[in-house]
Every structure is written in structure tokens, then in C-alpha cells.
């Protein structure tokens, strides 16, 4: 064989090999606009929320739109948000989701938690479990993520709805909180403010700005959540019963204009974040790697970045972020992250779809 031809073939082969080795992901569900949340059904099909108000079932490489959704208020950051299965979904069939709704008092909308069942391609047995009030025409800070603990309590987050100076620090008001309910929507008897006069009994923690990532740590059973700061001051927190997480009294962030709204980054009696980002990365979506699919990455926390369009692999030492490594750089605005039943990590990316993170 001519030496030049041989060398040309070798260069092409090495280039292709290098490309295949450096490929970080493969697209599993293409052509999604804003996959705000997704979850895996027992048959490994995927239930996906699109922020503009669609629920999609992806099965056998085919998308089917689910009918029977409640009326969804789409404004600013609000719309159809997270979705999660009951831990005993195989036994009871319950699906839980959060969305913005105009129901209730006042103009505009606010975050709502509903449960329902899937019958064919239709939602049935729908029941609102919680509706934050009052409604607001502001377009920001609806939250919202959902997580279940081992006792089947459901936790869900609602942002401060742009009412920074009233909502987060007042337990008689909704918004700027993480809530806990029983799986049927009733209030757990050991909720922290159940005996406080005038308090919203579903509140589990308060002093939050806009939590858009929440997950039960599979190694410790703690509730981990992250939230958006303003200009700087995005946070990761470990959520504890009845605790105050400081917003807006204490923050590492400043106003978007560059002015300060507080000189304090910590206050006695309020919880400090275990990690914060300045400048902001605009975090959304969260998952722990608990499978063996990624080797030494097991135990890492994954956080999506809307602003900088990557996934941060947070390497943990105890309850601290020791180091961050950027994955899927420039992939697009990362909205949601889940570990599938197969142990692989799946990432929802705006204007792309859902991708599978490939082990190296």
C-alpha cells in the first residue's frame, strides 16, 4: 500500500477514534424545548414535563402527549414544572407534579402540587394537594422541585415569587419555603410549625429564594437542595426541619444593579450554605451518582447550570464540596438531572432534549 494512502487512513482512523473516546453524551429524547422535569416509569419509559404546559410520555422511541392536564399558568419562570413518582408507584400508580395555577385568590398565579394517575394517555383521579397563595402577576421564582423520603413524605419547594422582603421570613405566608406533606396531601403531625398560630402548617423550612434542585442524599438520607441567588450567592443547603436559611437577611449575593441589600453572609440562628457560587451559575436540576456506572465518580453530586450551560460534578468530602469539575460544557441550558433505573445519568437540556451521560 502506498505510504501516503496508509498514513491518510491512519489519520482518519485516529481522528474518529479520538472523537468517539471524547464523546460525553448521547441524545435519548430529541427535540424538547424546556424539559423542566422527568422521571422513569417501571417499564423504563420516561414521563417528561415541558414548561409550556405539556406532559410527554416517551416510550419505544416515540413521544405521546398526555391529555387531561389541569389549566397551567405560563408566565415568566412559571409553567409546568417538576414530576415525580410515588416510591410505591407499582402498587398505587400515583404521579406528583408541580405547576403554576391561577386558581385561588388574587390575579396571576402561584405554585401548585397535584397528584394524579395515568390511564392510557390520560391523567385521571387528579387532586390538588397544595396551592400556594396569594396569586401574583410576577413572573419569577415559582421553584419548584419534588422529593420523597423513606417514610413517603413528599417535599416540594416554592420560590419567594419575587416578594423578597415579605415572603421568605414569614411563616404565616407562602413562598420562599420548602414544604412537607404526607403522600395524600395531609399535614404530618410532626411538622415543625403545626402548633404555631397562623403559620402555614405544611412549611418544613424557610428563608429560601428560589430552589430549583432538591434530592434525598442516598448515602445519608438527608435532604439536599440548591437555590438561585440574585447576582452571586447561589447556594447548596442541607435542609433541616424548622430551620431558617437566611434569605434575604444573609446572602453572598448582591442586587442585579450592583448595590447591596445586606452586609451579612451569616447570622446566628440561621443556617449557612454548605457551598455557594459567586458569580452565579443559575443552578437547576440535581442528582447524586449512586450507581457504579461511572467508577470513581460514585458519590459525586451533579448540579446543572442554566447560565454557563454545563453540569458541575461536585466532589464531596463529607458535607462539603471539595472540588468541582465541569461536564458537558456548552451543551445548552441544563434544566433537569436524574439517575435512571439503569444507573446512568440523564440530563434535560433546553432546546435539545434528554441526553445520557456516557462513562469515560
Language-model-derived ranges and their functions:
Residues 1-23:
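Bacterial Sec-dependent N-terminal signal peptides
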Amino acid at each position: 500500500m502506498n505510504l501516503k494512502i496508509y498514513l491518510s487512513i491512519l489519520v482518519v482512523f485516529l481522528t474518529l477514534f479520538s472523537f468517539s473516546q471524547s464523546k460525553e453524551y448521547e441524545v435519548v429524547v430529541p427535540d424538547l424545548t424546556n424539559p423542566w422535569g422527568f422521571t422513569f416509569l417501571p417499564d423504563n419509559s420516561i414521563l417528561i414535563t415541558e414548561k409550556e404546559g405539556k406532559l410527554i410520555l416517551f416510550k419505544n422511541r416515540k413521544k405521546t402527549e398526555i391529555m387531561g392536564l389541569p389549566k397551567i399558568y405560563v408566565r415568566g419562570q412559571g409553567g409546568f414544572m417538576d414530576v415525580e413518582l410515588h416510591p410505591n408507584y407499582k402498587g398505587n400508580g400515583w404521579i406528583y407534579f408541580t405547576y403554576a395555577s391561577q386558581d385561588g385568590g388574587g390575579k396571576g398565579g402561584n405554585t401548585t402540587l397535584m397528584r394524579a394517575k395515568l390511564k392510557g394517555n390520560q391523567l385521571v383521579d387528579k387532586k390538588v394537594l397544595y396551592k400556594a397563595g396569594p396569586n401574583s402577576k410576577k413572573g419569577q421564582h415559582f421553584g419548584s422541585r419534588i422529593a420523597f423520603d423513606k417514610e413517603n413524605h413528599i417535599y416540594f419547594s416554592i420560590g419567594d415569587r419575587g416578594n423578597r422582603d415579605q415572603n421568605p421570613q414569614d411563616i404565616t405566608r407562602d413562598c420562599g419555603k420548602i414544604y412537607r406533606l404526607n403522600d395524600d396531601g395531609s399535614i404530618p403531625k410532626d411538622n415543625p410549625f403545626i402548633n404555631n398560630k397562623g403559620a402555614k402548617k405544611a412549611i418544613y423550612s424557610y428563608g429560601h429564594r428560589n430552589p430549583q434542585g432538591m434530592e434525598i442524599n442516598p448515602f445519608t438520607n438527608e435532604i439536599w437542595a440548591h437555590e438561585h441567588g440574585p447576582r452571586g450567592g447561589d447556594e447548596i443547603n442541607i435542609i433541616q426541619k424548622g430551620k431558617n436559611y437566611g434569605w434575604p437577611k444573609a446572602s453572598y449575593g448582591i442586587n442585579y444593579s450592583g448595590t447591596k441589600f445586606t452586609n451579612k453572609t451569616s447570622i446566628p440562628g440561621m443556617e449557612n450554605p454548605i457551598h455557594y457560587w459567586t458569580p452565579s451559575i443559575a443552578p437547576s436540576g440535581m442528582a447524586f451518582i449512586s450507581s457504579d456506572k461511572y467508577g470513581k465518580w460514585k458519590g459525586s453530586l451533579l448540579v446543572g447550570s442554566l447560565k454557563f450551560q454545563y453540569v458541575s460534578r461536585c466532589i464531596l468530602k463529607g458535607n462539603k464540596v471539595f472540588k468541582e469539575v465541569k461536564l458537558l460544557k456548552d451543551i445548552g441550558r441544563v434544566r433537569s438531572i436524574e439517575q435512571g433505573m439503569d444507573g446512568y445519568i440523564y440530563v434535560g437540556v433546553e432546546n435539545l432534549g434528554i441526553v445520557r451521560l456516557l462513562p469515560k
